[in-house]
């Protein structure tokens, strides 16, 4: 189909949608589009998976459980399922992971950016398998949340504001290649030499560090202005 051709160069992963909500001991997975084993799946209705307390990480996975070659088409049988094995096989993708204490509720609303990686009782999206043009990607929801928090910062530099708008205006997730370029430029403090190749939780931690730096004015326009004023005073 035209849609399969449009996304033929994308790797396996979530391409759009699949937003998560937790209520009544159920994880609700919204409509979306997923590529798995080089086939595009359109999820047109909400799916639900019941969850229970777990003292170790449990992964919510999208899984192809059966593939049948018929005379004129291929039929797939798929499922969303919880698995305490975090490793993925070729027919699996991770949607999220979590640890849940007995008596606690699972949260999909976050207090702040760092909260996405809170150890217990929170849906963790940092290691979800997302797909973008150009390669694998960090969750669109994670990068959008990062962008919104950057735009709340008065000290944000123009380049951070521009990148935040780029993330928010992108209809799809942004590849790790682009994200790593931004991380490298920020980490090198203007001396762009290193090449970063981080994914998942490590990429999330880098963005968390950058956001904290922006919030504290570690590399802000305000600091640049202060340095210039001090130089003017010295010259006088």
What are the functions of these language-model segments?
Residues 35-236:
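Beta-strand-rich solenoidal segments
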Residues 1-45:
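N-terminal "first-domain core" detector
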